[in-house]
């Protein structure tokens, strides 16, 4: 069974809801027509606050390895902390939080998603939205098009940090 993924900024793609925890397959990522890079890293963890340090560390390590400047790495870590905290607080019990860090030539794209009981995890105009747009060069949200219910609905946030040489 597939549902339509509603990308709030870019049309949509399909999501295979039969995957465990309602996770999306690689081909279902809202990459705006781009394929995931060969250096992309995906980490799936229980949607619990105890896992925030691990997620921040992963993003910080990849950002540093990718030669983002110190401030850009710090901003990206803070943005990921905010995104993941919001997702964890809205996640269904026993949900899995999925984090994908995709280094590209001119940017690092981070996508976080989880099965949530609401689509109002991060709403444009909210305090969290302002924090995220101050920390990342681009912020987008997406969900799988289903209304949140007992089974939840996949909600995600994509952050983009551009390299200093490419107009940061």
UniProtKB/Swiss-Prot annotation:
Composition-biased stretches (Polar residues): 7-16
Keyword list, A-Z: ATP-binding, Hydrolase, Nucleotide-binding, Transcription, Transcription regulation
UniProt record, GO biological process: negative regulation of DNA-templated transcription
Null allele phenotype: A double rsbW-sigF disruption shows no effect in the presence or absence of rifampicin.
Segments for region (Disordered): 1-31
Binding of ATP, residues: 124-128
Induction of the gene: 9-fold induced by starvation.
GO molecular function annotations of the record: ATP binding; hydrolase activity; nucleotide binding; sigma factor antagonist activity
Function: A cognate anti-sigma factor for alternative sigma factor SigF. Alternative sigma factors are held in an inactive form by an anti-sigma factor. Binds ATP and GTP, may hydrolyze both.
Domain commentary: The cytosolic domain interacts with sigma factor SigF.
Subunit text: Homodimer. Interacts with cognate RNA polymerase sigma factor SigF with a possible 2:1 RbsW:SigF stoichiometry; this inhibits the interaction of SigF with the RNA polymerase catalytic core. Interacts with anti-sigma-F factor antagonist RsfA with a possible 2:1 RbsW:RsfA stoichiometry; this blocks binding to SigF, thus indirectly activating transcription. Interacts with GTPase Obg.
Family: Belongs to the anti-sigma-factor family.
Protein name, as recorded: Anti-sigma-F factor RsbW
Gene responsible for this protein: rsbW
């Amino acid at each position: 069974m597939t549902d339509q993924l509603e990308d709030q900024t870019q049309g949509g793609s399909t999501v295979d809801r039969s995957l465990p925890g309602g996770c999306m397959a690689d081909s279902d990522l809202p990459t705006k027509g781009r394929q995931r890079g060969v250096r992309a890293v995906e980490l799936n963890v229980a949607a619990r606050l105890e896992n925030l340090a691990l997620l921040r560390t992963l993003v910080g390590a990849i950002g540093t390895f990718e030669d983002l400047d110190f401030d850009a790495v710090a901003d990206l870590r803070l943005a990921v902390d905010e995104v993941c905290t919001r997702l964890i607080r809205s996640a269904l019990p026993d949900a899995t939080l999925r984090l994908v860090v995709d280094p590209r030539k001119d940017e690092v794209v981070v996508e976080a998603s989880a099965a949530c009981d609401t689509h109002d995890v991060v709403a444009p105009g909210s305090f969290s939205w302002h924090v995220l747009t101050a920390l990342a060069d681009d912020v987008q949200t997406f969900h799988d098009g289903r209304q949140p219910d007992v089974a939840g609905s996949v909600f995600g946030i994509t952050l983009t940090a551009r390299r200093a040489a490419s107009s940061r």
